[in-house]
Amino acid sequence: MPHPYPALTPEQKKELADIAHRIVAPGKGILAADESTGSIAKRLQSIGTENTEENRRFYRQLLLTADDRVNPCIGGVILFHETLYQKADDGRPFPQVIKSKGGVVGIKVDKGVVPLAGTNGETTTQGLDGLSERCAQYKKDGADFAKWRCVLKIGEHTPSSLAIMENANVLARYASICQQNGIVPIVEPEILPDGDHDLKRCQYVTEKVLAAVYKALSDHHVYLEGTLLKPNMVTPGHACTQKFSNEEIAMATVTALRRTVPPAVPGVTFLSGGQSEEEASINLNAINKCPLLKPWALTFSYGRALQASALKAWGGKKENLKAAQEEYIKRALANSLACQGKYTPSGQSGAAASESLFISNHAY
């Protein structure tokens, strides 16, 4: 067994751990506002709004400048490259706006999924080339954490061991590079909800994928206390005819995490995976009420599940700004309660709260 070559100094480790804990402080989660230009185009199209840089800026500003009621709810915001360099109407750069509200600035650093030859339509994620230099620059420009998404599909013969291994290794390489540059990596191995598989199959696959991810992180000497995990919840496939309760989903999810995620990891920030706004909050609440020992913060890193009602209320019209912000605040407050196991569904909900946000074969 070789001797360890220290990858990080004690000071570097402390900085990373502190950042990670700030993001997942009690009651806090993450706003994922890192949709690529192509993805935000679909959101804007859904409300009949043109995909211009100004519309994108205005919409992100709407979310980032919601009043102080969101401050105790949002520990971090993930931005797309373009957004990191945009400014609010008052001239403040967006990172400054986020920090002034007590949030940590995050940046999406992957370059999207690409086909993995020799597999049945499986993918890996590109973007390792030049990543160290980009991280160094992003750190200077105010970002303290990053996100990298890998995607796996459940099918008769998927995910293959090749896809699991390759994606685990690419996540570990990314995480290691981020930490060298003072950036906390969010590790996102998303298992898509496409398919007719049941809850048990999703749980089994989730366990295998997470076990591989943490083995790779160990092999690459990644400092776990300075990372976060962004997994899917364990849910049945969208085409599964059998219905499962929120408690069953919570139990399967927490069981899978307990079997695979070391307690050194400070927090698990679930992706919403096309669940409706309300469903994402109810499931997160059930996960936090699950009667098993949970050594990590279990919170949210939601995109559509925080934004859908706000987007609809805005409708691309400046005069709807306040109404849209109210919808966003409503979801932020709901999820802040849910990550503490204190959410009671109100029945009254936002403009799009119960609409399914599922997109088949979702690519950002």
From Swiss-Prot:
The modification Phosphotyrosine is found at residue 5. Keywords: Acetylation, Cytoplasm, Glycolysis, Hydroxylation, Isopeptide bond, Lyase, Phosphoprotein, Schiff base, Ubl conjugation. It catalyses: beta-D-fructose 1,6-bisphosphate = D-glyceraldehyde 3-phosphate + dihydroxyacetone phosphate. Its main location: cytoplasm. One of its GO terms (molecular function) is fructose binding. The modification Phosphoserine is found at residues 36, 39, 46, 132, 272. GO terms for biological process: ATP biosynthetic process; binding of sperm to zona pellucida; fructose 1,6-bisphosphate metabolic process; fructose metabolic process; glycolytic process; methylglyoxal biosynthetic process; muscle cell cellular homeostasis; protein homotetramerization. It is found in: Cytoplasm, Myofibril, Sarcomere, I band; Cytoplasm, Myofibril, Sarcomere, M line. Its EC number is 4.1.2.13. In vertebrates, three forms of this ubiquitous glycolytic enzyme are found, aldolase A in muscle, aldolase B in liver and aldolase C in brain. This is Fructose-bisphosphate aldolase A. It comes from Rattus norvegicus. The gene is Aldoa.
